[in-house]
Amino acid sequence: MQNYDHLGQVFKNLRTNRHISLKQISNERVSAAQISRFERGESDISLEKFLIALSNMHIEVSEFMDAVNNYQRTEQICFMSALIPLEYERNIAGFQKMQAEEAWEFSEHPDIYRHHLNVILLQSFICKCDATVPFPEEYIDEVTDYLFTTEEWNMYELILIGNLYLFIDIPLLHRMGQEILKRKDYYWEIGSHKNLVTITLLNIWETCLHRDALTVALFYMEKIEPLLNDETDLYKRTIYLFLSGLLHYKQGEKQSGIEEMKNAIQIFEWVGSENLANNYKKDFERFVR
């Protein structure tokens, strides 16, 4: 069994939550000492002994695997939550500390590729804080290989694309965007995934505009519009208004494009989103001549 320290922790959580002692689940075929070492991640345990211990707790394998998956999701949510204040503070040292921790985890557990992907994800935050720091090309290759050999793209895969899009060339990024659109019916069943899909597609659209890939940008404008049918979703609809204005401006419809961009900035000001208003003012000044 791989990742036995991780599985051992889940096993221990299930046992202690049920107030079951090691003695109660041990017998002549699996000792309390063996189970204890497995729980602490100090040694592996054979599949036969593991199934005996699980059966002695009256837990089905499917129930255990549900707990494992939930543990992994919780672990990743904690990781992502730690990034938010660091990004707000532009705390490069904090990102580097987390990156070193993830690199160590991967060196200890090379079969848990998520730790290496977290190293790459953290590098993207460092590069966004300091534009002089290069983003290694091999990281893009590794992420691309990972994504296109992963059958289902869930929240983590969307987060990867949504944070690495600045470093991916347009043809490859467009390919990723098209894959997301193919799967959107699946994502639409889960509210958090639906929101992340829309934000990721808006990011792809924005970087296409910034890099003057107008044909691809028009593709995303047309695909994103029907996704924004909720009138209460002011944030994403306002970003859409600004980006559509920028596209129209770059296509030569300068006056209507300027009006759309100014209207979007004004909406952010009206609702008190000063940081967003200022960010889009900078974009406006950057592109409007």
Language model segments and positions:
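Alpha-helical adaptor scaffolds
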Residues: 157-234
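Short, charged recognition helix plus adjacent turn
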Residues: 66-93, 266, 270
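"A position-specific structural signal for the A-helix of alpha-solenoid helical repeats
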Residues: 10, 49, 81, 115-126, ...
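Short alpha-helical DNA-recognition segment
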Residues: 19-37
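Helix-turn-helix repeat elements of alpha-solenoid scaffolds
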Residues: 87-101, 132-141, 170-182, 211-222, ...
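A short, Lys/Arg-rich alpha-helix, primarily the initiator
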Residues: 1-17
